[in-house]
Amino acid sequence: MMKKKFRLTFKQRESVLGYMFISLWIIGFFVFTFYPVIYSFFLSLNRVTIPTTGIDLEFIGFANFQHAFAIDRVMILELGTFIQDAVLMMVIINVFAVIFAMILNMDIKFKGFFRTIFFLPVVIVSGPVMQELLNNNAIILPGITNFQVISVFSSIFGESFGELIVKVFNNLISMFWFSGVQIIVYLVMLQKMNKEVYEASEIDGASPWEQFWKVTLPFIKPIILINMIYTLVMLAGFSNNRVIIIIKDYMLKTGEVGAGFGFSAALSWIYFLVIAIIVVLLFLLFSLGRRNIKYIRNTEHFHLDMTRYTEKDTFINKNPTVKKIRKKLMGRKGTDGWVFRLFVYLLIASVAFTFLYPFIYLALTSLQSPEDIIDATVGLVPRTIYFENYVKAFKTIGFFTALEGSIRISLLPALAQVFSTALIGYGLARFDFKLKKLVVVIILFTFIIPAPVLMIPTYLMYRDLGILGNVGSFIYPALFGQGLKSTIFIMIFYQFFNTIPKVLDEAARVDGAGPIRVFLRVTLPLAVPAVVVVFLFSFVWYWNETYLTGLYIDGARTLPLQLSRFAASFREQFGNVDPNAEDFVDRINEAIYMAGTLISILPLLLMYFGLQKWFVESVDRSGITGE
């Protein structure tokens, strides 16, 4: 009797294919995330020393945690400052982003230009660039904190409120610079709103202010939560963050209690738990009243009441000439008249200038001669154009060597990340399998894990695998879906593939194409916008990464890292000139720093303006917001 041939059911086949496509992520998660997280916690319970023979562990329980809270409280105090600043910046950045997304969603001229300006800092600003601009007060508008209004607020509400206002104004450009992604995401979401809802609410007598609170805000509320979390994670992982700098410094010290890998791991876990608590609080805050929110996506059953407002008879309403002038100045709705549009253009132009001011400062200061630098009568504009600063900065950075290093460290991991995240996103979007929702939740959860939690175990693992010190420490995690910000890219592909009809895949299968062939020949070519946005942002984020690059690849020479070593490199090239000597031509100064900063961001500037259409429009078309 012949045995019955075993055949998979459709459901089983879907599960097998789904797990096959996400298998890279499963392997990568356990190797590059789950194991490092568990091992990091284990290290935090030990005194760790790293002799030449390996690693020595001595179990000490929670002594490292106790030491962090009771004795060496440097990181804890810095963490408190970070939380205050992060909460303030999260709120201001997202309020600003919502306002300007709504402005860009209006029918205004030069929309593409303003959008390009607002997105510029996202692409080119790395930790060292931000640090150089901070050191030279280039991201503080001149006189911004001298307004009398600050004194008035201080006298009315107290010194603490006045200090808060000063802090906000001092960090205004920084906050604006961190808002580019959020503006684009809100803008994409607003463009998806049904205009009929606004028209219906307008007929009902709703003012623009009421439309915002009752129509727009409920619709974008889920995206506000996502952007708040993204902002928090972005601030927590920024290489200039003092908390992660302190954690890294302790890691490289001796293996006593209060120093070394064990203590650094304990600090990392404290940091992680604080971020996780903030994320949970955000979820709880945004879940309040969620059941009472009604998302209006169409006009069906929308109640209209045109007797809500009655217009009183006044001179303005009765006189035709006055009514005509008023209509031109104020518009029919108050938001389409000359006065409002003039205000909008002045506001958006002022903010665009604020975005560009550091680059203007950078360019003009870099052209100043040493004489201009020390002459108090010379303002921002140099008296003569002095290109020698660029000659010295070019030599100090070692431009071509650093450029080659930046490309090597950015290109291969970016390509690996595109490949892996596309496969994973396709598997999640196209196939139903058991534990799929759990996989998605875990993928999203990994986004909030700060780099310090993973860096110590991965450092030791890469050392044992022989990939420490080369670009493999970036390529292998990226190849298994665990690269820089891989969660975002997986979700981009997941959302984009969901917009492509499954009938195309089914037609290709009927023609005899296998699942891999369908993915490569049918679905992936349709996902070009998503591929472009993932590659460009992967490339840029690997390019700008200095914290992990400096840790994993000792001696790496990239443009951002060379900028962070600028002063030491300058002394090697030109000697340590006495700053009090009369011959100060070769002395390092602000102009040379600015020239070095501009040189370090020049390749990204050229790439951004050459490909800005892809940078900005691909975000629009890639389904980054989800639904």
Regions found by a protein language model. Name each.
Residues 11-299, 303-305, 340-627:
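A structural signal for multi-pass alpha-helical bundles of membrane permease subunits
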Residues 1-12, 317-333:
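Short, Lys/Arg-rich, polar N-terminal cytosolic tail immediately upstream
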